[in-house]
Amino acid sequence: MLNKDFDVLKNWMFGSLSSLLDDIPPNPNLNILKMSIGEPQLGPPKFIRSQFDNFFEDWGKYPSSEPIPVLKDAIRDYLNKRFPGSKKIINFDKNLLPVPGTREALHLIGLISKNVQKKNSIAVLTNPFYHAWKAGAIESGSKILWLNAEESNNYNPNIDDLSKETLERTSIMYLCFPTNPQGALTDIDYFIKAINLAKKYDFILAIDECYIDIYRTSFSKPIGCLDALIKMNENLNNIVIFNSLSKRSNVPGLRAGFILGDENVISLYKLLVSNGASPVPIPVQNIAASLYKDENHNYETCLYYDQNFKIAKEFLKESHPNLKIPDAGFYLWLPVNDDLKVTIDLWKDYSVRVMPGTFMAENVSGQNPCKGFLRIALVHKKEIVKEAMQRISNYFKNNYV
């Protein structure tokens, strides 16, 4: 009765972490510090509080799949400021659609990419992966081809080695920049290469840019796929870009973002929403518009994460003297000798819950690209981050990394 294709989704990182730790009691003398999940803790910007009352009546209206005018204008202004020149290549009536966060959209885009003309189709996925990409690949009916994102290639999946036969069978390719969880960036040339492949071999290039506005303030803002398209003076054919407010504006519960891309894909996605997926409520669209209009709160958020990474580097300077602070994102990607053992020890002895890298990626040719790393979410207030880093530092003083 049930679709067995989805059995593989039961094996996901948080379920695996629960299986690893739930039967092990934490240290009863220490409060639990949950550093395993990337849920922003800074809190929503205060200026949106009143807007929940301002748009109260709109909860009584069915939302359209289309963006309301104020949101469309806000996104247009945001994109043109963030990616100068973008208005030259975007038709905001045909290339843009609001989505209730990007997790659903990343999943459903796989269904849209299903291509019966491509026999034995392939979905190319970055490894480590976000579970919505994997769900989308399953929806596409394709065989998954994993591309490892490793330190040796600056966590940029190697698309150069994809064969002509593989590319001809590809229905969708998922890439994520800045990378998750390592916070690495890419360059214009990489984007241009990926864009050209998508257009030449006619597949959907899905670019997850949910961390595009979480960056270290001492560096330039990360480049995005739009920067490459602008430089190429190319249209959005074969491209879909995913943008979310969850990380940018500390509102993961708002479920607001947008997809920008190929007008044929957007048109089909709109049809899918009209027939059974989720449109974005009108009050949420109004609040999202206010957030996209404001840059100050986003910059303050980036400063907040800058401080947390400085704290981590200071506490870990003895155990990890060459610790690299990521260019973007809010995860510390910490190398260790045995990530599963360290995860258990930190929980059992120090009541700190972290995510072992092993659970975040698939084994490819007998190798897991994330084995030997911990993902530590530096999303909490600095007092909590200090306490967590102190405990982790104490652990490393008494144990081999």
Question: Can you describe what each PLM-predicted range is?
Answer:
Residues 140, 200-201, 319, 350, ...:
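Helix C-cap/helix->beta junction micro-motif
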Residues 81, 85, 235, 348-353, ...:
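PLP-dependent enzyme catalytic core of the Aspartate aminotransferase-like
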Residues 121, 200-204, 236-237:
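A short helix->loop->beta-strand "cap" motif at the edges of active sites that frequently abuts
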Residues 60-197, 212-214, 218-233, 385:
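Conserved core of the PLP fold type I
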Residues 5-104, 291-292, 398-401:
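N-terminal small-domain helix-loop-helix segment of the aminotransferase-like
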Residues 17, 35, 52, 75, ...:
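Generic structural signal for small/hydrophobic residues in well-ordered secondary structure
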Residues 78-79, 227-306, 310-314, 390, ...:
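Conserved core segment of the aminotransferase class I/II
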Residues 285, 289, 305-313, 322-336, ...:
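Conserved glycine-rich beta-strand-loop-beta hairpin in the small C-terminal domain of fold type I
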